Design a protein with these regions (language model features):
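Secondary-structure boundary elements
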Residues: 1-60, 68, 135, 145-161
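Hydrophobic/aromatic-rich core segments of domains that either
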Residues: 17, 32, 64-147
Length: 162
């Protein structure tokens, strides 16, 4: 899901070359470039949408932004991973959707988060559920069904400050 193709590489070329001494500057510029080039549009992609497909479509959701960021960071030899979880919405306790963001490993700092969809770095409102190489490794819920029976999965999440 995070292999860079021509469209992801085109985004990478628009960001100034990473300074080995200041990778955070590059990563913030990369995050902003992805947000500018790939419009957030709910419902336009799925869990199997690749970074390249989202970049080619020019639209996606948080997981697509994270996949593109991860592909680009890795192309610059910066370790990056996918994070799935929840973002506490200030106007409600009950959360209606999962959220995704990316993290890059910076020497001396460790894993640094980038929420490309919202244009910010994660803060205490973010609840991490899983990390992995991509969505498939960090999906909040996975499973398999055999047979033709109907089913419904319901998940209720409440996130509140203590």
């Amino acid at each position: 899901l995070t292999k860079p193709g021509p469209k992801v590489r085109a985004i990478i070329r628009e960001v100034p070359e990473p300074n080995k001494d200041e990778p955070l500057e590059y990563l913030h510029a990369l995050s902003a470039m992805i947000r500018d080039r790939v419009e957030y549009q709910s419902g336009c992609s799925g869990g199997d949408t690749t970074a390249e497909e989202a970049a080619a479509n020019g639209k996606g959701v948080c997981q697509d932004h994270a996949h593109i960021f991860i592909a680009a960071a890795r192309a610059a030899d910066i370790p990056a991973r996918y994070v799935s979880g929840y973002l506490m919405m200030n106007d409600r306790v009950e959360q209606v959707a999962t959220h995704a963001w990316a993290e890059a490993h910076i020497d001396g700092l460790g894993w640094v988060g980038f929420d490309i969809a919202n244009g910010i770095s994660p803060d205490p409102r973010y609840v991490r559920v899983a990390t992995g190489l991509d969505y498939l490794q960090a999906a909040p819920v996975t499973g398999m069904r055999i047979g033709g029976a109907d089913e419904t999965l319901r998940v209720d999440i409440e996130v509140a400050q203590q």
